[in-house]
């Protein structure tokens, strides 16, 4: 991602004026061993399956893709983002093959069936409804570990 000083003025102004949440003391739980965890990906790369509705500027919703999907597209609005590595190997941003290898080798318990993508750079407050829906879906699927991949 580009430096904020190199962004267009309108983007720089938008990002500079975002209210960031204040976190007091987070609640932590003792995690289970990695070999028992079910892992799902959440990314802000605006990734979706080919044919799904593309993300729009400051989209508040999310897209779902399956652990077996490989025909994925990135519709992130940041023009300064270099997509060349992604175009050669989707594992650069969505490491599904690596996670499946880790599960097969017993390093992690399993890979969730569903994974989630958002449009980065949107106001987090406007995404809360969608984020809660994703959390609900992950809980239903037994996900206890999320691999966060910001773009």
Go through the PLM ranges and name each one:
Residues 1-151:
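An N-terminal assembly and electron-transfer interface module characteristic of large anaerobic redox
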């Amino acid at each position: 991602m580009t430096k904020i000083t190199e962004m267009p003025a309108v983007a720089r102004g938008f990002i500079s004026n975002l209210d960031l949440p204040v976190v007091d003391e987070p609640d932590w739980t003792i995690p289970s061993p990695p070999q028992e965890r079910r892992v799902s990906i959440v990314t802000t790369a605006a990734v979706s399956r080919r044919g799904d509705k593309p993300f729009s500027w400051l989209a508040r919703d999310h897209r779902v893709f399956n652990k077996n999907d490989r025909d994925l597209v990135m519709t992130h609005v940041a023009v300064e983002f270099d997509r060349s590595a992604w175009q050669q190997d989707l594992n650069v941003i969505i490491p599904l093959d690596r996670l499946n290898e880790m599960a097969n080798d017993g390093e992690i318990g399993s890979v969730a069936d569903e994974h989630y993508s958002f449009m980065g750079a949107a106001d987090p407050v406007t995404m809360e409804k969608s984020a809660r829906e994703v959390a609900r879906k992950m809980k239903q699927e037994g996900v206890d570990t999320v691999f966060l991949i910001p773009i």
